[in-house]
Amino acid sequence: MKFVIVGRGILGSSLYHMLRKLGHDVVVVESGERRVFPSLIHSLLLKDKDIELARMSLDFYREFSVPMREFVSITLGKIGKDILNSWERAGVEIGETYVDWLKSNGIVARGGDRLVYVSKLISSVPFVRGKAKVDLLQEKVYLDGKELHADRYLVVAGPWNPCLLKVKSKSYYCWATLVASRMRELGNHFVYDYEKGFYSRPLLGLGTGIAIVGDGRVIESPPGRRIPVQEDEVLDRARERLGPLVPLYTAGEFCEGTPDMRPAYGPITDRVLYAGGLDGYGAEVGPGLAKLLVDFIVSGEKVQEYFLDRFSHVTNFTIGREPHEI
């Protein structure tokens, strides 16, 4: 079978490798407009079925030798016992203890968090550069005005999906700030602070006090616009916990959010299928969602919790906060 994949992000790259492994002919098209960050968070410290997607993603990264680096994480705030038990069932070693450098009790987790070097995954995928257009009535895809012939078209273009398919999702802008701190521990730990409302992740993991801080806040906007942000809104809260922080650089990118801020997949027509709504945690759930789409194509298997038709009665919605991590 021949597939055309529209979008070479985490989803498109994962689908490419999965379908090629099954022996299919696959062409990936990409406009090249999106920024590809070198590394992103992969965490198992999620909730409910998202943990299963994250486990599937982790298996994919290992199978296809995507580089990763594991870190200890510290979660601050009250976390329900049912969630803690689900983390342990996923293979994470957790324990509550006093963390001197944070001056607070926290849940210390080992085996749950890592940086995954998604740029290596994405750069491994050959692609044809150009702007795609989808004609749903004719079930055709055009690249710069020229029809692309395939048996199935998989549209996984992230924040451009609402424009291409009119799916019930929205484009939004999310951002985080690179900071310098006197706390060297920030450079080799993840911190999820649900009391102050921020997260922190290492930049490189060298223990130099250089980290990336954000809070999952979003601004709804079509992709490609220049969006001004107030970085001190999150940094002031982070300083209450971490002390002095010097902002070095703030960067962001456009993402795609669904009405419930969880991933979605399913058919738009018989030949045009969709996956998306990664909601800022695509490195965690992206390859897992790609696997669900492949399973649906091959066998018709559906996981209703993530299936696109759950939004069939949604008429209007507002994007929520990104799930970092629960």
Spans of features found by a protein language model:
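Beta1/beta-strand and adjacent pyrophosphate-binding region of the FAD-binding site
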Residues: M1-L11, V27
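Glycine-rich FAD pyrophosphate-binding loop
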Residues: K21-F37
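Short hydrophobic core segments
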Residues: V4-V6, L148-W160, A290
